[in-house]
Amino acid sequence: MGKRVLIVDDAAFMRMMLKDIITKAGYEVAGEATNGREAVEKYKELKPDIVTMDITMPEMNGIDAIKEIMKIDPNAKIIVCSAMGQQAMVIEAIKAGAKDFIVKPFQPSRVVEALNKVSK
């Protein structure tokens, strides 16, 4: 049984692409969320091993969602996948508790590398 991943992104095609990469890498998709608030709810409900988190989303952004998830589980393994690759945003995500930061558009191998790194 592979590790379970919660995919969080407001773009359906991005969730689909991540789902494909994640399952091909031998991980299981525990669920999907389309915004930060939903991500926090799904995290509580599904208790995934890993979360992929977008930053720019409606209702609650990824940084706030990371902070909320870290309150629930200080050991949460969150990988940020965002087009916002500015240094300040990366630092803010890591400070909030993210374990890795992947800049979109990304290569599937980069996602697999991040999954393998955080699941150790």
Swiss-Prot record:
Positions carrying 4-aspartylphosphate: D54
Keywords assigned: Chemotaxis, Cytoplasm, Flagellar rotation, Magnesium, Metal-binding, Phosphoprotein, Two-component regulatory system
One Gene Ontology term of the molecular function aspect: metal ion binding
Cofactor(s) required for function per UniProt: Mg(2+)
Residues reported to bind Mg(2+): D9, D10, D54, T56
GO biological process: archaeal or bacterial-type flagellum-dependent cell motility; chemotaxis; phosphorelay signal transduction system
Subcellular location: Cytoplasm
SUPFAM superfamilies: CheY-like
UniProt cofactor note: Binds 1 Mg(2+) ion per subunit.
PTM summary: Phosphorylated by CheA.
Response regulatory domain residues: 4-119
Keyword Magnesium: yes
GO terms under cellular component: cytoplasm
Alphabetized Pfam families for the sequence: Response_reg (PF00072)
InterPro entries given in the database record: CheY-like_superfamily, Sig_transdc_resp-reg_receiver, ST_Response_Regulator
Task of the protein: Involved in the transmission of sensory signals from the chemoreceptors to the flagellar motors. CheY seems to regulate the clockwise (CW) rotation.
Listed name of the protein: Chemotaxis protein CheY
Lineage: Bacteria, Thermotogati, Thermotogota, Thermotogae, Thermotogales
